[in-house]
A protein has these predicted regions:
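Conserved phosphate-binding catalytic cores of ATP/NTP-utilizing and phosphoryl-transfer enzymes
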Residues: 48-77, 83-91, 246-251
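Glycine-rich phosphate-binding/hydrolytic loop that grips phosphoryl groups
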Residues: 57-65, 106-111, 118-119, 123-124, ...
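Short beta-strand segments
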Residues: 28-30, 76-83, 87, 100, ...
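Active-site nucleophile and cofactor-binding loops and adjacent substrate-binding regions
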Residues: 5, 47-57, 78-80, 96-101, ...
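Glycine-rich phosphate-binding loop plus the immediately following alpha-helix
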Residues: 91-146
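Glycine-rich phosphate-binding loops at beta-strand->alpha-helix junctions
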Residues: 27-37, 196-197, 201-225, 241
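Short beta-strand-loop/turn "lid" adjacent to the catalytic site in phosphate-handling enzymes
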Residues: 2-6, 17-52, 85-95
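Adenine-nucleotide phosphate-binding core of ATP-dependent small-molecule kinases
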Residues: 150-205, 212
Length: 251
């Protein structure tokens, strides 16, 4: 079982798979780049190309059983990888769509800003940051005594990067705050979208998975908070970045 990012070095992957041919007589491939490897090895060995969404569904079912010791209930599965897709678990699995926001957007943005490509380093910096040094909250707009806005709504984000004004001295803006804000912006938008979709399908359980959430406590806190506000249950499974690979292995 091997799980890889979309932007992985394909030549290195092919070398790795070539070295493993003596140990295995069958390869199962899934994901957007799976076709490249399936085509490469199809004439040499038993190679199968699997539907990405079906593989993820099977992987999540397996991880849920291992983590919770029971079958997966009716749920909305939100897989945040390079991009994001939604799967509805309700009498089977159904792909509902997704978003371009995710790890690909995040890594591309921090590469443009800071010329870094280390995800874990970015997370460490973000943990030291404070998004509200640059993000505009509703409470920054409405006066404290304004009865039109309740206490919960005051804590919502009115505008990501909303405190970065035209005359701001950019040298005063901290890298840690920007990366923190960026992660929160992704989480808030995906969390809001997921909760609206879940409500439309009368779903209470939201299962969040994918490589972007690996050791990403900031996103986990944001997604949990949004679910709590919307009276939904946020579920995070260990090793969920491997759900596609697990599903492919078991197919």
């Amino acid at each position: 079982m091997l799980s890889l990012s979309t932007q992985s070095d394909h030549e290195k992957i092919i070398d790795f798979l070539n070295n493993k041919k003596k140990s295995f007589n069958k390869y199962n491939f899934t994901g957007g780049k799976g076709y490249i490897y399936h085509k490469k090895f199809l004439k040499e060995m038993d190679s199968t190309l699997l539907n990405e969404f079906q593989a993820h569904a099977k992987g999540i079912e397996t991880l849920y059983m291992l983590n919770k010791k029971k079958a997966i209930p009716d749920s909305l599965i939100i897989n945040i990888g390079t991009g994001t897709f939604l799967l509805l678990k309700k009498q089977g699995f159904k792909h509902l769509g997704g978003s371009a926001l995710g790890g690909g957007f995040f890594m591309g943005f921090i590469k443009l800003l800071y010329n870094t490509h280390d995800f874990q380093e970015a997370l460490s910096l973000a943990e030291k940051g404070n998004r509200y040094n640059i993000d505009l909250k509703v409470s920054d707009i409405y006066e404290a005594m304004d009865h039109r806005v309740n206490l919960i709504f005051r804590e919502f984000t009115a505008a990501s990067f909303g405190k970065i004004k035209y005359d701001l001295d950019l040298s005063t803006v901290k890298k840690e705050d920007i990366i923190n804000s960026l992660i929160c912006m992704i989480g808030e938008n995906l969390g809001t979208m997921a909760n609206l979709v879940a409500e439309n399908h009368n779903i209470k359980n939201l299962i969040f998975c994918g490589g972007f959430l690996k050791e990403n406590k900031i996103s986990e806190r944001i997604l949990s908070t949004i679910c709590k506000i919307n009276k939904k249950k946020a579920i995070f499974l260990k090793n969920s970045e491997f759900c596609g690979a697990i599903g492919a292995l078991l197919s």
